C-alpha cells in the first residue's frame, strides 16, 4: 500500500464542509477511504466539572488536542491503525470507547480549524476551504445544535454572537489563504465535488 492521500476540508460552522466531505467519501469504495473528524479531537475534560465545560470556547484552537490528531495522522501515513476518540457533545467530553481506523488510500480530515495549525497543513496533500455566506451558516448551526446536540435556541444564538462569529473572523476565515481550492456554496456545489473526486483519482494513479 502506498502513502495515503490526505485531504483537509475546512470552513466555518454550518458551511457545508461535512457535506462536501461526505459527498467525496461516498464517491469511493469504503475499503479505500477513511474519515477523520476534527470534532473527535476535542480535549479530554474528565477533570473539569460539567458546568465549567459548558462555558468553554470550543471554536478556539486551544480546545483541540492537535498533538493527538497529528500523531494519529502520522500513524495513518505510516500505515498504522489508530484508535480515534469519540466525543459526546451533550456531555462536552470524550467517551471512554474509541473507533478503530485502519490506514486507507484516502484519508479525509474535516473540521473548522484543519488549516489553522501548520503542522496539520504540512501533512495534507489537498487543502479545501468551503466558503458559505454567514446567514446560511448560522441557520444551519441553529438547526444542527438544537436537533442533534440538545441545545436551546437562546444558547445557540448567544454562543454564535459571543464565541462562534469572533472565532470565525480571528482563526477560520484567515486560514482560507492556505487552501488549494475554495468551494463556494458548500455541499450543493456538485461541479466542484466532481472535480475534486477526479483530482483525487488522478493522485491515486500516480
From Swiss-Prot:
Gene3D superfamilies: P-loop containing nucleotide triphosphate hydrolases (3.40.50.300). Its main location: cytoplasm. Pathway: Pyrimidine metabolism; CTP biosynthesis via salvage pathway; CTP from cytidine: step 1/3; Pyrimidine metabolism; UMP biosynthesis via salvage pathway; UMP from uridine: step 1/1. It holds the Pfam family PRK. It is found in: Cytoplasm. InterPro entries: P-loop_NTPase (IPR027417), PRK/URK (IPR006083), Uridine_kinase (IPR026008), Uridine_kinase-like (IPR000764). GO terms for cellular component: cytoplasm. Keywords: ATP-binding, Cytoplasm, Kinase, Nucleotide-binding, Transferase. Its EC number is 2.7.1.48. It catalyses: uridine + ATP = UMP + ADP + H(+); cytidine + ATP = CMP + ADP + H(+). ATP binds at residues 11-18. GO terms for biological process: CTP salvage; UMP salvage. The keyword Lipid metabolism does not apply. One of its GO terms (molecular function) is cytidine kinase activity. Belongs to the uridine kinase family. This is Uridine kinase. It comes from Clostridium botulinum (strain 657 / Type Ba4).
Amino acid at each position: 500500500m502506498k502513502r495515503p492521500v490526505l485531504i483537509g476540508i475546512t470552513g466555518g460552522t454550518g458551511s457545508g464542509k461535512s457535506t462536501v466531505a461526505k459527498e467525496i467519501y461516498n464517491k469511493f469504495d469504503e475499503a479505500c477511504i477513511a474519515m477523520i473528524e476534527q470534532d473527535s479531537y476535542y480535549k479530554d475534560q474528565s477533570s473539569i466539572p460539567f458546568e465549567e465545560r459548558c462555558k468553554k470556547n470550543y471554536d478556539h484552537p486551544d480546545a483541540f488536542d492537535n498533538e493527538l490528531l497529528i500523531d494519529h495522522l502520522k500513524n495513518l501515513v505510516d500505515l498504522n491503525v489508530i484508535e480515534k476518540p469519540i466525543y459526546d457533545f451533550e456531555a462536552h467530553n470524550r467517551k471512554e470507547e474509541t473507533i478503530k481506523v485502519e490506514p486507507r488510500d484516502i484519508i479525509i480530515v474535516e473540521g473548522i480549524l484543519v488549516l489553522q495549525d501548520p503542522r496539520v497543513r504540512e501533512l495534507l496533500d489537498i487543502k479545501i476551504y468551503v466558503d458559505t455566506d454567514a446567514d446560511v451558516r448560522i441557520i444551519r448551526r441553529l438547526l444542527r445544535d438544537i436537533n442533534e446536540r440538545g441545545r436551546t435556541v437562546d444558547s445557540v444564538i448567544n454562543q454564535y454572537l459571543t464565541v462562534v462569529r469572533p472565532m470565525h473572523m480571528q482563526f477560520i476565515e484567515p486560514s482560507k489563504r492556505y487552501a488549494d481550492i475554495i468551494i463556494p456554496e458548500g455541499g450543493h456545489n456538485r461541479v466542484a465535488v466532481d472535480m475534486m473526486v477526479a483530482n483525487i483519482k488522478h493522485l491515486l494513479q500516480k
